[in-house]
From Swiss-Prot:
PANTHER family: NAD(P)H SULFUR OXIDOREDUCTASE (COA-DEPENDENT) (PTHR43429:SF1), PYRIDINE NUCLEOTIDE-DISULFIDE OXIDOREDUCTASE DOMAIN-CONTAINING (PTHR43429). Its cofactor is FAD. It comes from Staphylococcus aureus (strain MSSA476). The lineage of its organism: Bacteria, Bacillati, Bacillota, Bacilli, Bacillales. Substrate binds at residues 15, 19, 22, 39, 42, 71, 299, 427. This is Coenzyme A disulfide reductase.
């Protein structure tokens, strides 16, 4: 009976194991997870902190006991894989509760260890990062136990923005700092102005080009020379792949510690796959490498690897489009395609339109800004971005499907919109992009 070992029990690992069991009732499947919880919703964590998700239990899909009962898959939490011997096809596992080590053999090995939050490295009792449910519980408990009021949020990526909004909605007083003037880097820089407007509207302090210089208790000294007091600091300064344990194996890592994979999510070593935040692949619509550490990619990779292991060796990954979205107070920011800093590799043109998200005479209308970049050589769409209070999500999802099917910007005129005054226009913003590009 084949033995399948999975490293990591969150989006990629747990999903892959579950899909394998759906296709294969016989194999022995075991998952090692170094942390306390398995199969939790990472994307829910800021909303648990903000008490938008009223009970943390809704963010936890399975316990190991429930997972085994439903799927006959063994999950061992607090068990960290610390080494791989790919020649003998074994992994070395550390039981983090007992500090004991043991070896586990495998026929197939699936690596989905995820990534860890970067830290600024200050020794302080008031600094936190947010990456898992344990972090969420620690933040929530600290807020309650210490009557937290003023919170410093460091960083201006998606997670930091979501955390800041949820702290504010919880009734706390957050302040945002970021080390540069480039916030929310997945979005075009000039389309981020509503983020600052939303902060100003609520009188939430923020400072760009600012960093922490020192922390002494609750006293924070900044690079600008300012000295302020905060009850809590939440750091959102990026992540790094959990690949240290892989370095002693023959598995190839790139210079940043990620694992390059082929279209079957195979590594360079036979019988070893990599999925989720640890893996790098390529874009679907252009010939460029892509690392997209988001939920859709982990789930898609999990399904493909499960099919491969179950015997369907014809299924392959066609690449990422990098579709992403974030809510920040009243606004939605969404984009798809290559990142803004990758556009310079193409000869491109940009076309954009700003108009109401639905018919102007229908109540509740607000501006929606839609922008599309296309390759001048073949007129195929490279990137699209949308910002507004309404309708950004559906326009970007439609454009994602257009890019998936290699439509040209001109063909957007043929998009048949589901039109009624509360929802759109007879000529939708997507149509207008196509007309303006001609």
């Amino acid at each position: 009976m084949p033995k399948i070992v999975v490293v990591g029990a969150v989006a990629g690992g747990a999903t892959c194991a579950s899909q394998i069991r759906r296709l294969d009732k016989e194999s022995d499947i075991i998952i090692f997870e170094k942390d306390r919880d398995m199969s939790f919703a990472n994307c829910a964590l800021p909303y648990v902190i903000g008490e938008v998700v009223e009970d943390r239990k809704y963010a936890l899909a399975y316990t190991p006991e429930k997972f085994y009962d439903r799927k006959q898959i063994t999950v061992k939490t607090y068990h960290e894989v610390i080494a791989i011997n790919d020649e003998r096809q074994t992994v070395t596992v550390l039981n983090r509760k007992t500090n004991e080590q043991f070896e586990e053999s495998y026929d197939k090995l699936i690596l989905s260890p995820g990534a860890s939050a970067n830290s600024l490295g200050f020794e302080s009792d008031i600094t936190f990062t947010l990456r898992n449910l344990e972090d969420t519980d620690a933040i929530d408990q600290f807020i309650k136990a210490n009557q937290v009021d003023k919170v410093l949020v460091v960083g201006a990526g998606y997670v930091s923005l979501e955390v800041l909004e949820n702290l504010y909605e919880r009734g706390l007083h957050p302040t945002l700092i970021h080390r540069s003037d480039k916030i929310n880097k997945l979005m075009d820089a000039d389309m981020n102005q509503p983020i600052l407007d939303e902060l100003d509207k609520r009188e939430i302090p923020y400072r760009l080009n600012e960093e922490i210089d020192a922390i002494n208790g609750n006293e924070i000294t900044f690079k600008s020379g300012k000295v302020e007091h905060y009850d809590m600091i939440i750091e959102g300064v990026g992540t790094h792949p959990n690949s240290k344990f892989i370095e002693s194996s023959n598995i190839k890592l790139d210079r940043k510690g990620f694992i390059p994979v082929n279209d079957k999510f195979e590594t360079n070593v036979p019988n070893i796959y990599a999925i989720g935040d640890i893996a790098t692949s390529h874009y679907r619509h252009v010939d460029l490498p892509a690392s997209v550490p988001l939920a859709w990619g982990a789930h898609r990779a999990a399904s493909i690897v499960a099919e491969q292991i179950a015997g369907n060796d014809t299924i392959e990954f066609k690449g990422f489009l990098g579709n992403n979205i974030v809510k920040f107070f009243d606004y939605t920011f969404a984009s798809v395609g290559v990142k803004p800093n990758e556009l310079k590799q193409f000869d491109y043109k940009m076309v954009e339109v700003t108009q109401g998200a639905h018919a102007n005479y229908y109540p509740g209308n607000s501006p929606l800004h839609l922008r599309v970049y296309y390759d001048t050589s073949n007129r195929q769409i490279l990137r699209a971005a949308a910002v507004g209070k309404e309708g950004a999500d559906k326009r970007i999802d439609v454009l994602s499907m257009a890019m998936m099917n290699q439509l040209t910007v001109d063909e957007l005129t043929e998009f048949e919109v589901a039109y009624a005054p509360p929802y759109s226009h007879p000529k939708d913003l997507i149509n207008m992009i196509g007309y303006k590009a001609k």
